[in-house]
Each structure stands twice: as structure tokens, then as C-alpha cells.
Amino acid sequence: MYRLFCNDRCLKANNFCEDLLSVDNKEIRNSDDIVYKILDWLYDESQPCLDLGDVDGRDLAYAVKTVFRQAPAAGGVVIIDNQFVAIERNGMADLPKGHIERGETPDVAALREVEEETGITDLEIINELPSTWHCYLLNNQWTVKKTSWFLMRTCSGMKNIPQTEEGITKVYLIDKQGVADFEKKTFASLKTLVPEIVLSLK
């Protein structure tokens, strides 16, 4: 299922052809109705959820391309001693992540961002986790951010060197008992990752 978050509100659909987002395809799709539904949902904050059901995945992809500017990002869930690394960013519980730079692959960007935001080095990717999607209004342009997530480990241990220029004030570890508290204090899009995180903790 495709889920796109706007703060605590969610757009969801059963079908989504993500590959079409990166293709300059001139194919004409009948996506105007979906575009209008998305825009109505974005500007009407009284709508908590927009469920597009079994909409054609290609039509939805073209609608997303029409409505949003794309800003891909990548991040990591770092496991240390059966705990995971979290950060406090602008007062919210978060995971280390950031924009993918030109020429970078998501995995390389994730390793770089985690090290920059936490100070943790010698990182190794174990496997890929589900991506999250959220959107926001920036300079009068709706932007969609797909964040590619990776499960990681390190042989150098925990460090607490927050990247303060990015609004990060704290780097800390959370065990399985602390997951519920993290979930209360984090973003709606990240809550979808919690089951995967729990599976990674013994």
C-alpha cells in the first residue's frame, strides 16, 4: 500500500507505479480527477485521510508528478547493543536522515547522513527497510519527500555528536521498552517504520 503523509494526515492507495516518477514519459494519462482530489485534500485540513482505494497506479504516479516537486532523501536505523539510535530534531523524536545529493545512490546518502547527524562512524548496511513518504509546502510549492531507509550496524560504538546546524540537539539509544514513547513523540510517517524497528531488536 502507498501511504503519503501530510503532518498527521494520510493519503493512501492500493496501487502506485513509483518507477514512473523518474521517467520523462509523454504518455497521456487520465489523472486530472486524482490531481483535484489530492489538491482538495492538501488544502482542506478537515480531511484526515484520502483513501484512493484501487486507483490505477500509473494514474496516481502521474498525478503525484503533477502536484509535487520531488525531494528524495535517505536515512538509517542504526542498531547498537539491541537498541536503535534516535535523535531529537527541533523538539521531535526522529531518525537520522537527509537529502540525497546529486550523483549519490540512496544507500551512500544514508550512510553519509547518519554519520553527519550523529557522529557515528564505521557504519555498515544490513538490509533495506520500507520507504516513507511525506509532503510539505515550501515556497508556495508542494514538495513530496520519499525517504529510503536502511538498517545499519557499527563496530565503533555509540557516539553523541549532534549536528546542531540541522536542529539536532541530542543523539540517544532506545531499547524495546522505549519504542512506545518514541512513537508518541515522532512524525506520523516514521510510525510506519516502528514494526520493522521492533523486529530488529531482540
Residue ranges and their predicted role:
Residues 1-43:
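N-terminal leader/capping segments at the start of a protein or of a new domain
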Residues 32-75:
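Acidic, metal-coordinating catalytic segment for phosphate/diphosphate chemistry
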Residues 189-202:
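Charged phosphate-binding loop/patch that engages nucleotide di/tri-phosphates or the phosphate backbone
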